[in-house]
From Swiss-Prot:
Annotated PANTHER family: METHIONYL-TRNA FORMYLTRANSFERASE, METHIONYL-TRNA FORMYLTRANSFERASE, MITOCHONDRIAL
GO molecular function, one term: methionyl-tRNA formyltransferase activity
Record-given protein name: Methionyl-tRNA formyltransferase
Enzyme class: transferase
Family affiliation: Belongs to the Fmt family.
Gene that encodes it: fmt
Assigned EC number: 2.1.2.9
Gene Ontology cellular-component terms listed: cytosol
Organism: Magnetococcus marinus (strain ATCC BAA-1437 / JCM 17883 / MC-1)
Catalytic activity field: L-methionyl-tRNA(fMet) + (6R)-10-formyltetrahydrofolate = N-formyl-L-methionyl-tRNA(fMet) + (6S)-5,6,7,8-tetrahydrofolate + H(+)
Length: 312
C-alpha cells in the first residue's frame, strides 16, 4: 500500500518519540507544525522546540504559526495534502476546519488511559493520585478536549518509586511504536475507533510551579507521591532557613512529630514528620547547588533533629 503523507504537530520532548518513530516507519512525514521559538534563560536567547530541532536534523519543512486557526496556516496545511495529521502535545487547539483537512482525519497520541486524565498533565496527575498504571491512548481527534474515539492503548505500570520523568520516558517510547502500529492497522485492517466510556472521566489540570511547595500537614503518602510526580519538574520543595530545598527520592516511614519537624537525622538521609506518618528524604537540591544525596548535603550543612522545615 502507498505510504501516507503525514503532517506531524507537536512541541516538547515527549512528542519527539512519536516523530522519530514516524521517521523510522513506512510513511512519509511531509511537514512539521510546532510552537514558535521562545526566549529562555538569563540571556533570553531564542530556543527552538525539541520537535523543530529533530525535524531540521531530517530536513523536514517546519511551520510555526502563532495560531493554527490563522488563514495562512490553514492554507499551508491544506496545500500539503496530508493523508493524516498526527498530534502529540502540540499546545494549540485544532479547529473543525483543520480537523477536516486530512483524508483520514487527525490522530492524537495522549499519555493516559482515556477517559482517565484528559488534559494537559496526565503523567504527573496519575502519580499524584496513586494510580497503579498509566499508558498511552491513540485516538481520533474531535473538537472536545481529549474526547475522541479510541483506536488503541498500551498500559504502563506505576510503582512506588516511579517518577514523573521516568513515566514520561516510558510513555514517550511506547507511544511512538503504538502510533506506527495503529496507522498500519487502519490502512491494512480498516481499524475503526471505539467511543470512550462515559464513566471514569477525570481531568489533568496543567501543572503550576507553586504546586511543588510541600504542605507537611498532609499525609506522608501524599507528599511522597508529589515528590515522585514532580521530579524533574516542577520539583517538590520546602523551605529550610528561608530558602527553597528541593526534595527527591522520598519514602514513607513510621514516625510521629509536629508536621515539618525533622525527627531523625541519619548518615544517608533525614526523616520529617507529616500530618500522618513520616517521610524519609534520600536526595535534595539546595538553592544554587546541584542535586545530591541527603548524606552529602547533611555533611555540608548539618540540619539538626528538631528543626522545622517549611518555615520562612
Amino acid at each position: 500500500m502507498t505510504a501516507w503523507r503525514v503532517v506531524f504537530m507537536g512541541t516538547p520532548d515527549f512528542a519527539t518519540g512519536t516523530l522519530q518513530a514516524l521517521l523510522d516507519g513506512p510513511d512519509t512525514v511531509v511537514a512539521v507544525f510546532t510552537q514558535p521559538d521562545k526566549p529562555v534563560g538569563r540571556g533570553m536567547k531564542m530556543q527552538k522546540t525539541p520537535v523543530k530541532q529533530l525535524a531540521e536534523q531530517h530536513g523536514i519543512p517546519v511551520y510555526q504559526p502563532n495560531r493554527l486557526r490563522e488563514a495562512e496556516a490553514v492554507t499551508a496545511l491544506r496545500a500539503l495534502r496530508p493523508d493524516v495529521v498526527v498530534v502529540v502535545a502540540y499546545g494549540q487547539i485544532l479547529s473543525r476546519e483543520v480537523l477536516e483537512i486530512p483524508t483520514h482525519g487527525c490522530i492524537n497520541v495522549h499519555a493516559s488511559l482515556l477517559p482517565r486524565w484528559r488534559g494537559a498533565a496526565p503523567i504527573q496527575r496519575a502519580i499524584l493520585a496513586g494510580d497503579a498504571q498509566s499508558g498511552v491512548t491513540i485516538m481520533a481527534m474531535e473538537e472536545g478536549l481529549d474526547t475522541g474515539p479510541m483506536y488503541s492503548t498500551v498500559v504502563q505500570s506505576i510503582d512506588n518509586h516511579t517518577t514523573g520523568g521516568q513515566l514520561h520516558d516510558q510513555l514517550m517510547a511506547a507511544g511512538g511504536g503504538l502510533l506506527v502500529e495503529t496507522l498500519a492497522r487502519i490502512k491494512h485492517e480498516g481499524l475503526t475507533p471505539q467511543i470512550q466510556p462515559e464513566q471514569g472521566v477525570t481531568y489533568a489540570a496543567k501543572l503550576k510551579k507553586e504546586e511543588g511547595l510541600v504542605d507537611w500537614s498532609q499525609p506522608a503518602i501524599q507528599i511522597q507521591r508529589a515528590v515522585q510526580a514532580f521530579d524533574p519538574w516542577p520539583c517538590a520543595f520546602t523551605l529550610w532557613q528561608g530558602k527553597p530545598l528541593k526534595l527527591f527520592a522520598a519514602s514513607v516511614v513510621v514516625g510521629h512529630g509536629t508536621p515539618g519537624e525533622v525527627i531523625e537525622v541519619e548518615k544517608d538521609g533525614f526523616v520529617v514528620a507529616c500530618g500522618d506518618g513520616a517521610l524519609r528524604v534520600a536526595q535534595v537540591q539546595a538553592a544554587g547547588k546541584k542535586r545530591m544525596s541527603s548524606g552529602e548535603w547533611l555533611r555540608g550543612h548539618g540540619v539538626k533533629q528538631g528543626e522545622r522545615l517549611g518555615e520562612g
